[in-house]
């Protein structure tokens, strides 16, 4: 019996053909990331993949009035969180095996009236969501995702900057020759939240009629004209719209050996995707299997699409009712008897920044899944 614990490098212990399986999984995950730039797009991608793997809409299952071992169900909660359930042989009252992850990620949201003109440029005012290093958002290509509800009730889906033939957006920074004062500031103050203004245009609207008055804010006017022409929206529609700014880059392999992945949203879509593929492999479990994909973790799990909401509890209550005589006690027992794995990312040891971790107790890259015994410290 070995008395000492030895952490093993996964790469060194792969069996024949397992490297191909690892790389195939990585490529599927990268495709998932590219289709899941926001929590809304991620939820839609999860549902699409779930349907392809035999999962039925929760509301349609309720209409049938019955469930049985092996029934696969998905719940779409406001297009921002998803629950996937595979009914087990034992009753729900006996408990569930649950893996929970979150599908929101740090980003920039547009303010209610974001568009303005200054210095012959049109810009968008933003409000950062989650914990962001503000300086990291300057001078990188950005894409815009969102939905707009117009006055006549139409829902318009917008995505700009993801395809090669589409424009991208930028947040400006100072050139080095003018940065003397900025460079003296603390890193956290070099770029402020109020400076995270997204450049969306520079070309002014020019009046064809020479007799017509000069257009006020002609660059802003031109951007509004483009938006109206392409999507049928006006400035007032921004109030009811939901727009998110995220990095436009696609997921890429990192390293000459393609052993790592660069992408926005690893936290926590890496765990979300693992939970997704895992439940797709479940057929008729002994205990009901659940994968949860929830929103708003980055800002404290508040709101009706987060884990603080009742959407999952309500779902389980309805499913228990389909299994027989309903009672609140059965719902309480179902949760009390359940086992839950909270699947989120943690930090791996980085030799460039060794001072932030206790190396003897740090997760090592390439050494498999990590269990975090404590968290929350900065």
Question: Which sequence ranges carry the predicted segments?
Answer:
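N-terminal hydrophobic/helix-forming segments and targeting peptides
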Residues: 1-378
